[in-house]
UniProtKB/Swiss-Prot annotation:
Pathway: Porphyrin-containing compound metabolism; protoheme biosynthesis; protoheme from protoporphyrin-IX: step 1/1. One of its GO terms (cellular component) is cytoplasm. NCBIfam families: hemH. Catalyzes the ferrous insertion into protoporphyrin IX. It catalyses: heme b + 2 H(+) = protoporphyrin IX + Fe(2+). Keywords: Cytoplasm, Heme biosynthesis, Iron, Lyase, Metal-binding, Porphyrin biosynthesis. It is found in: Cytoplasm. The keyword Cytoplasm applies. SUPFAM superfamilies: Chelatase. Pfam families: Ferrochelatase. This is Ferrochelatase. The gene is hemH. Belongs to the ferrochelatase family. It comes from the Bacteria.
Length: 354
């Protein structure tokens, strides 16, 4: 095996610590070509699609990418921001927020972000850390709930990059923070602030709050993936923080792909059923998505909204994701700081002289 070229070794190396925020990824542009390139990388990950690759690649290249590329590009174009992809824009803002927060608290760390699929990728970010003299790395997935198809594959990519390094950094990983008090507080604050601006649902009259998490195939639960249980845990803690019961709030799962059974109940059918049952207003919040993206803005804000209205509902509210909310940046900083303990990340303080 040939290893990557290393920067010159020096006794005067920076000995820095790096914090890498990792999110899923996004196409570089809302065009069929860019979307197909992104989907090819994403859907070729065996952590994401757990069927024999020989069979899957034939289906992916001959059927799925040609059909989904153009259709998905139209959806991306509908949510694209002037600055670029929403996921990238909000992730950059979160990175800058954490960087500023840690610096203001005397942390001497390098903070950056990477995407599991697309760019900037994890290997590129780790290489940049190495060039900056980083010798300790904290991998911080932006997925509060652990899943093999998100958290584990992000770590896979990082470890694959490390395997090509002659001089590896010390590494720590943040596995999950589904029940972290600061994360739950940030979620509750996001919902409360939205209601303060747009009015609180009339739960006494039957209005509902739906907490929609990204779905995964049900077989992953049967095979031991803790994602489902952690989503339910987050949902229960958020309900408690908001003072709601399961009569007023429910947990659902979205973004089903293919014909296999996924975690249920499914979000879109649930909203249609609520509308048909006479629910006047439904608010949908996506606690597992730390930044707004195609699945929240387009799928929830457009497709699921249409399902609710078609079912007979009247008022649909999509509560924005955490994005750059002050409480969320504070929570990120707190979680990062907890996982940096024991590393020399603050300037040495002069000793007190009596």
């Amino acid at each position: 095996m040939r290893f990557d070229l290393e920067p010159p070794s020096s006794v005067a190396a920076a000995h820095r610590t790096g914090v890498l925020l990792i999110n899923l990824g996004t196409p570089d542009a809302p065009t069929p070509r860019a979307v197909r390139r992104y989907l090819a990388e994403f859907l070729s990950d065996p952590r994401v699609v757990e069927i024999p690759q020989v069979v899957w690649q034939v289906l992916l290249r001959t059927l799925i990418l040609p059909l989904r590329g153009r259709a998905s590009a139209k959806k991306y174009a509908a949510v694209w921001m002037p600055e670029g992809s929403p996921l990238r824009v909000y992730t950059e803002r979160q990175t800058e927020g954490v960087r500023h927060l840690l610096a203001s608290n005397a942390y001497q760390v390098t903070v950056d972000y990477a995407m599991r699929y697309g760019s900037p990728n994890i290997a590129q970010a780790l290489a940049q850390f190495k060039r900056a003299g980083v010798e300790r790395v904290l991998l911080m997935p932006m997925y509060p709930q652990y899943s093999a198809s998100t958290t584990a594959t992000a770590f896979d990519a990082a470890f694959a990059a490390l395997a090509r390094m002659r001089n590896q950094p010390e590494v720590r990983t943040v596995r999950q923070y589904a029940d972290h008090p600061a994360y739950i507080h940030a979620l509750a604050e996001q919902v409360r602030q939205y209601w303060a601006q747009h009015g609180r649902p009339d739960f006494a009259a039957g209005d509902k709050l739906v907490l929609s998490f990204h779905g995964v195939p049900k077989r992953t639960l049967d095979l031991g993936d803790p994602y489902h249980d952690q989503c339910q845990q987050t949902g229960a803690l958020l309900m408690a923080a908001l003072g709601l019961s399961t009569l007023e709030c429910r947990v659902t799962f979205q973004s089903r792909f293919g014909k296999a059974e996924w975690l249920q109940p499914y979000t879109a059918p649930t909203l249609r059923e609520l509308g048909a049952a006479g629910v006047r207003r439904a608010d949908v919040f996506c606690p597992g998505f730390t930044a707004d993206c195609l699945e929240t803005i387009e799928e929830i804000g457009m497709e699921v909204r249409d399902e609710f209205i078609a079912g007979g509902g009247q008022a649909f509210h999509r509560i924005p994701c955490l994005n750059g909310a002050h409480a969320w940046i504070g929570a990120l900083g707190e979680i990062v700081a907890e996982n940096l303990q024991g590393w020399p990340v603050k300037a040495a303080q002069p000793e007190m002289v009596n």
